[in-house]
Amino acid sequence: ILFKYLKAHPEIKKIWTLHDCWAFTGHCAYYTYAKCDKWQTCCNGYCPNKKEYPKTIFSKIESNFNRKRKIFCGVENMILITPSKWLKNEVNHSFLRNYEVMVINNGVDTKVFKSTPSNIKQKYNIEEKKVILGVASVWDKRKGLDTFIDLSKNLSSDYKIVLIGLSN
C-alpha cells in the first residue's frame, strides 16, 4: 500500500535507508556466506540461505523477488541511503540500481559518547598493547568471528583483540 501511494505521488521526495540486502532479494538479508548471487538477476530455484536469518519454511522466494522488484522499482523522486560503500555496491548490482544511492555512515553522538579516563587496559593487563576492537550484538560467522579468531593466531604479541558482544 505504501509504495502504491508513493508511486502515485511523484512530487513527494522520498528517502529510503537500507540496512541490509532484504529489499532486493527474494529472501535474504545477508547472502555472502552462501556465496549466492542469484539476486542480481532473479532469485529462483534452490535457495542456499533459506534456513538462515530471516528463516523461512516456505518456498515463495522467486515470487517474493518478483513482487519486490515490481513494488520497489519505478518510484519517482526517491533516493536510497546505505550505511556503507559495500551495501551501496550491492544495491548498484540489484534491480534497485536505477536509483541514486548515497552512503551516510552510521554516526556516533560525541556529546553522549566521549572519551573518558579508564583503567580497562590495566584491569586486563594490556597497557602496552595495541588494541583491535570488534563490536557486534551477537558474534557469529556472519559478523566476522571466524576472521577475528584467524587474525588472533597471526598477530604479533604487540596486539590484543578485544571483542564486545554475545557469543555461544
Show which residues each predicted segment covers.
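Conserved nucleotide-sugar donor-interacting segment of glycosyltransferase catalytic cores
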Residues: 1-45
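Glycosyltransferase donor-sugar binding loop
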Residues: 108, 135-138, 160-168
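Acidic anion/phosphate-binding donor-loop and adjacent secondary structure
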Residues: 89-92, 108-123
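A short beta-strand/loop micro-motif in the catalytic core of glycosyltransferases
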Residues: 15-19, 73-85, 102-104
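Short aromatic-enriched loop/helix-cap "lid" or pocket-rim segments at secondary-structure transitions
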Residues: 26-31, 36-37, 94, 114-117, ...
